[in-house]
Amino acid sequence: MTQRSLAEWLAYLERLHPSAIDMGLERSREVAVRLGLGRPAPRVITVTGTNGKGSTCAFIASLLRAQGLKVGVYSSPHLLRYNERVQIDGEQASDAGLCEAFTAVEAARGDTSLTYFEMGTLAAFWLFERARLDVAVLEVGLGGRLDAVNLIDADLALITSIGVDHADWLGDTRESVAFEKAGIMRPGKPALCGDFDPPLPLLERVAELDSPLFLRCRDFDLSVNESGWSWYGLTAVGEVLRLDDLPLLDLPMENAALALQAYALLDLPRDAEKIADALQATRVTGRLDRRHLNWRGKSLTLLLDVGHNPHAAQFLAGRLQARACAGRRLAVFGLLADKELPGVVTPLLADIAHWAVTTLPSERSRPAAELQAHLVSRGAHVEAHGDVASALEAQCERAAAGDEILLFGSFFCVAEALMWLERYAQEDVQDGNAG
């Protein structure tokens, strides 16, 4: 059989299973056994949560790599290239490596139908096992209990936050969401929770498993001032640790605090300077992602954020209010139909001078006209566009020097913006001008 390219593999995976999401571990476990998969690394950290999974995984990986450990990170979704999902020692997996992994999983699959995510998860585990990692950091795709990542018994289980999202799959209460996310815990293994008021099902699961629980505001926390922040936490034997004068971060420092608590439980060197440098160097594309653009002689700032639920919008609004803007703030906004529109836009209404709303390149997108009607009813200045690129270009034209353009609401929205920025940069070079 002719070898498939990565693009051909991904197209194949998209049509392999009748539904994009099919919760359950039975199919994946069956194929993993046939594939002969063991543990992806001697130590495994699994991360779930309504918000903050990606940045928490990135902080943990940075902290571990600063100590010379070889770390694999599995995350989703990707923004531009599938390779983003599988990182080994700070580098994205190669096309050739992913194709080899998909070939191995396909050979083991037989007649067992797997979803796109399940195939990708098993392929990542296959690559990690061969990379001889020290630590694997695994980000749950959806929920936790029935997510393919949960095939692996985690040494540390992290729950970043608990809010209502993906209600069709996880339920429409914090209690139902907590039950699903608590499914990543294992008997006697430490569990960490960044939500300082976890719902009862999570606490019941902790008691049932006799797992040590490290809870924010009780066992670890942070305090922030104008020049930096401090953290305290506990070691596995209950020793109190403290770090002061940590640098302020663009990414959520609450997630850095959770990552530090995970690090404290691994009994690794505690060089304060290395820790501070690792945190400050952490970047996550599409999360409070600041880009500078010269548009027709105007110096503009773009802020890209994949936040798409009320909790994420509240955090984003807080960060905008804490950081002064020389001019106005304009928005480019798109949202999927299963997301809570009023809850996402309300925290940001006071900060946005003008909205450009757009339909996203997904069958699940809310139409731009629906977004426009809602925002108009809330007294906002808004215009509708058919795609992200035209909305972004319209806001670039509207903006004056010193203005900031916030683009948020969906991974689809940020991915389209990143592709537009790539095209714009290429055209800029070809034209020999500054935009």
Question: Where does each model-flagged region fall?
Answer:
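A conserved segment at the C-terminal end of the G1
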Residues: V47, S55-G72
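C-terminal helical cap/extension that packs against the catalytic core
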Residues: F196-P201, E208, L213-F214, N225-S227, ...
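Short, flexible loop segments at boundaries between secondary-structure elements
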Residues: L360-S362, D428-G435
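Beta-strand->loop->alpha-helix junctions that form or flank phosphate-binding loops
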Residues: Y74, L192-D195, A207-E226, L246-D250, ...
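Charged, amphipathic alpha-helical linker segments immediately N-terminal to NTP-binding catalytic cores
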Residues: M1-S19
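Acidic, Mg2+-coordinating active-site environments of NTP-dependent enzymes
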Residues: T112, D134, E139, A154-L246, ...
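Nucleotide phosphate-binding/pyrophosphate-handling subdomain across enzymes
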Residues: A41, V135-L138, D147-L158, I162-V164, ...
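ATP-dependent carboxylate-amine ligase catalytic core
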Residues: E8, S19-I21, L25-P42, A66-I152, ...
